[in-house]
Each structure stands twice: as structure tokens, then as C-alpha cells.
Amino acid sequence: MKKTLLVNLFAGPGAGKSTGAAYIFAKLKMAGVDAELVTEYAKDRVWQEDQFPLQKCQLYVTGKQLLRIERVLGKVDVVITDSPVAIGSMYTDEKPYKDACIYAGKKYENSLNVFIRRQKDYNPNGRNQTEEEAKHIDEKIMNMFTENNMSFMTIAGTENGYDDLVEIIKNYLSMKGEK
């Protein structure tokens, strides 16, 4: 079983998590890294437009995301996700659910938490939040990191920022002797 590096991309909606995750995944695969991309369950539901009450079922949504991540851990060298488990805590006001999301997100010892600094214009297509709400989630994520002693790094949500992260991941794997 491999000791998978879990790369968690954090930011509010529209900051570039999905774009960055796809870009980073593609760059790693093209470099010969055994990597997998775990996409956002909640986004799948938004595109289905079936009025599934995401806000009222955050624990379910987070559980589905957790399953997506868990099923590939130990099978590849790197997993990149645009929907870290702990980010589920941003979408509920119920403390036990918030705590469960954060606890589940912190359990991965071999992880890299990356905050994407918003650089592009906000596109509301496929989102449930306004630009102001998305920026407020950015602030809540930074507070979550601080309040829960979660280590993280920040990169710009740009091609250069994503390239920097690809190099960090490749260097990490080289140090571990995996690539």
C-alpha cells in the first residue's frame, strides 16, 4: 500500500480550486506521477439542478466526499482534491457537524493543505453563493486553519501559483523516493 500524499485545495467558491486541481493533476500525470483527481461531490449535485438541499444535508455531502477520497488513498502517490473534507464545515451552522468535518479532515497525516488566493473574476455559473458570500467563505477558511491549528500554505490562483505547487509536490515525492 502506498503512502498517498493528499493535496487539499481550500478557498471559497470561484477562487480556482477546480481549475487548479485539474491543472495540477494533468501536470503531475504528464510528469509520470501516479496521481488521482478527486472532484467535488456537491458540484455534481448543483449541476443536476434537482433541488437537493445541500445546505440541510452537509454531513451527507461531506460523507460522500470522504468516500471519494478514501477509495483512492493508498493506491496512488498523490491525490488532489478541490473539495477537502474539512471544507464541509463552511457549509453548516451546526457545531457537531462542523466539528465532525474538521475532525475527519485533520485525520490525514500525510496531507498538504493549500489555500488558493483569489485572483480571477468571480463566475456565479454553477454556484449557490454570491461573490460576497464566496469571499466570506475565504475568511472563514482562514479562521478554521487558525482556530484548529491546521498547517497550510498559500498560493495564487494563477498558472504560476499552480506550477509552484506542482514543483513542491514533485520535490516532496523525490524526498520520499517515490518519483
Task: Briefly describe each language-model feature range.
Residues 22-66:
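Conserved substrate/cofactor phosphate-moiety recognition/catalytic segment
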